[in-house]
Design a protein with these regions (language model features):
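Conserved AMP-binding A3 loop
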Residues: 22, 131-158
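AMP-binding/adenylate-forming catalytic domain of the ANL superfamily
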Residues: 419-441
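Gly/Ser/Thr-rich phosphate-binding loop
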Residues: 219-222, 228-286, 300
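AMP-binding/adenylate-forming catalytic core of the ANL superfamily
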Residues: 318, 339-422
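Conserved pre-ATP/AMP-binding loop-to-beta segment of ANL
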Residues: 13-15, 117-135, 142, 165-171
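Conserved ATP/PPi-binding loop(s) of AMP-dependent carboxylate-activating enzymes
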Residues: 278, 294-298, 306-333, 363-365
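Conserved AMP-binding/adenylate-forming core of the ANL superfamily
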Residues: 5, 10-40, 47, 53, ...
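Conserved AMP-binding/adenylation subdomain of ANL enzymes
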Residues: 154-171, 179-219
Length: 450
């Protein structure tokens, strides 16, 4: 939290969150902390449930200045899921924005009716102190809790700045959820860099296009499903950075963005590493478009158990890496669950998530390969290949898609380009594929459909 105090002193009138300056955010943070001090005194760990807003950031900053661990809850959770997460993590105090319907102990508007008390604020917490906790889904369906420490935050913002650079006029558009690393990392980078962040409550296609094309912002983070909808409508010259990650990125989308001159930084990271660990600008490396980039400063990549083609399990080690999931053993080398390889220039290539690989009759089928191919067929909006249990082959591929081509057209297209064992046994058309709050396709939901 020392960054907020420092920026308020060095650049008090510089815009930080939307139209609020660093000094205004600092003052509001101190005021909010004074209101929360008594009410939160006996709680080391609290939960925050809110859509994106400057107010959410200020309440979070206040809780962090009070030395609290803050569980950030996904606003798309059901009431039962929220209760489960609060119980599992021994959280007894929930603060929520006024827009949230789940019954909270305090709403944002309640905070300022609380009695104020002089709070001792910790602007320089210990590196190993937990700042926020984010719950991430696991292959078992049971969530895992990722403790994000100040050491992880500091390592990330410094490495990100060194990789993508910083300009005084930078203004990063926040359309990804701030309860997720993809959104929160933007706020923390902007805080560290003394630059502006423009927070939107959610992804609004028309608003995003307008803000980019009128040069209100020059940086934005998106996931592929978002970019696919807007890339043809945004002006490349208005952007300095377009950070793209969150799921596997269709190759035809990257090729289209490259042709358009969009400064796409493909990125690879996860909650456990507090966002990006690997990245690169596609315009600077046209021969590496299928890669996800090179390691950020301080990040080590190891490929374990490689096959004959040197593809194996991707492991990461870095100061941005969590020590371990809450209530589980520490990790020194993190198994990402992805399969990939490094080339001679240390660019990383992802073949697939290990858990998504389909093994049919002893043959490995990589869904990403088939999905990338299908995205090159005009009219395909989104698609996902998932396994279906089969008594003869063990598993067979099942394809879900949204778009204008019919099933017969897709069958014909794929059969001319793929080995027979890779062809989907069934193709199902949907209006839209299920997605989470960050826009990732929910493959586990599709597997249940299978």
């Amino acid at each position: 939290m020392k960054w907020l105090k420092e920026q308020a002193e060095k650049s008090p009138n510089k815009l930080f969150l939307n139209q609020l300056t660093f000094k205004e955010v600092y003052d509001k943070t101190v005021q909010t902390a004074q209101h929360l001090n008594k009410e939160t005194a006996r709680h080391n760990r609290l939960a925050l449930l809110s859509e994106n807003s400057p107010e959410m950031a200020i309440v979070l900053f206040a809780l962090l200045a009070l030395d609290k661990e803050v569980l950030l809850l996904n606003t798309h959770l059901t009431a039962n899921e929220i209760r489960e997460q609060l119980t599992e993590l021994d959280v007894e105090l929930l603060i929520a924005s006024d827009q949230q319907t789940y019954p909270a102990d305090l709403s944002f508007s309640d905070i300022y009716s609380l009695e104020t008390s002089r709070a001792v604020l910790n602007w320089q917490p210990a590196p190993e102190k937990i700042a926020v906790i984010m719950n991430t889904s696991a292959t078992t369906g049971k969530f895992k809790s990722v403790p994000i420490t100040w050491k992880m935050l500091a390592a990330h913002v410094a490495a990100s700045a060194a990789t993508m650079g910083v300009l005084p006029e930078d203004n990063w558009l926040v359309v990804l959820p701030m309860f997720h690393v993809s959104g929160l990392s933007i706020i923390m980078r902007s805080l560290y860099n003394a630059t502006q962040a423009t927070i939107c409550s959610s992804f609004d296609e028309e608003e995003l296009i307008k803000l980019i094309n009128n040069s209100s912002v020059n940086m934005v983070s998106m996931v592929p499903t978002m970019l696919k909808r807007v890339h043809e409508k945004i002006a490349a010259e208005s952007l300095r950075v377009l950070l793209l990650g969150g799921e596997f990125i269709p190759q035809p989308l990257i090729q289209a963005c490259f042709a358009q001159g969009l400064p796409v930084y493909k990125t690879y990271g996860m909650t456990e590493t507090f966002s990006q660990s690997v990245t690169f600008n596609i315009l600077e490396h046209p021969d590496k478009l299928t890669s996800v980039g090179q390691a950020l400063p301080g990040v080590e990549i190891e490929i374990l158990n490689p096959d004959a083609a040197q593809a194996g399990e991707i492991h990461l080690k870095s100061p941005m890496l969590m020590k371990g999931y809450l209530n589980q053993e520490d990790v020194q080398l993190f198994n990402t669950g992805d399969i990939g390889y490094l080339d001679e220039d240390n660019f990383l290539y992802i073949l697939n998530r290990r858990k998504d690989i389909i093994i049919s009759g002893g043959e490995n089928i990589y869904p990403k390969e088939i999905e990338d191919l299908l995205y090159s067929l005009e009219g395909i909006v989104e698609c996902a290949l998932v396994p279906q249990e089969d008594q003869t082959w063990g598993q067979v591929p099942l394809l879900f898609y949204a778009g204008t081509p019919d099933v017969q057209e897709i069958t014909s297209f794929l059969s001319q380009r793929l080995a027979k064992y890779k062809l989907p046994r069934q193709i199902i058309k949907m209006n839209a594929l299920p997605k989470n709050a960050s826009g990732k396709i929910l493959r586990k939901n599709l597997k249940h459909e299978a």
